[in-house]
Amino acid sequence: VRDATAEGVRAAVYVQPNWALDRVVEEIEWIQGVHDASGWPHAVVGSADLFDPDAGAVMERQKALSTLLRGTRLQLHWHENPQYRYASGPATMHDPTFRANIGLLAGLGWLFELQVFPEQMADAARFVADFPDTSFVLVHAGMLESSEEQHVAPWRAGLELLAPLPNLTMKLSGVGT
């Protein structure tokens, strides 16, 4: 923290780094303790298993532990190449339990960090549009794989579908992931 402050950094957001989903409440308790001891971070994006019917209760427990929470994140990116895949399948945004839990976020005042590959962006645009009262952040600038045209074209087409959505912001991070 001293090094960052010396370089002019004045605030930081902790974004969950893939703790086990059965430990996400413990994670919030831990990061709140870090904040209590140091004053850092200033905001938190946590995680919860949004495919679990009990995710609402988990998020309520997280919220009770920390006023720093601003949202939640669950990686949905799926790729034909298993090495790039995180989600169990390409259509996770259609899961009824997942969608019900996303529907809880606006009431919590939380955003959802959306991590998808370009091939999922058309689906993501419909998904984001279905939840107009929830803020979404497109993670890693939409997961552009490389600067080769075969990758840039679907990425650009996907961004054109997402760009008009007023409840979506893009995070410039992890470009080229």
Indicate where each model-derived feature is located:
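Glycine-rich phosphate-binding "P-loop"
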Residues: 16-19, 74-93
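Short catalytic-loop micro-motif centered on adjacent basic/acidic residues
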Residues: 14, 43-46, 111-115
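Catalytic pocket-lining loop regions of alpha/beta-barrel enzymes
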Residues: 88-177
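Glycine-rich anion/phosphate-binding loops
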Residues: 51-59
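Conserved, mostly hydrophobic/aromatic
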Residues: 12, 31, 44, 62, ...
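An N-terminally biased module of ancient metal coordination in phosphate/nucleic-acid-related enzymes
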Residues: 1-33
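Short, electropositive alpha-helical surface patch
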Residues: 24-38, 125-137
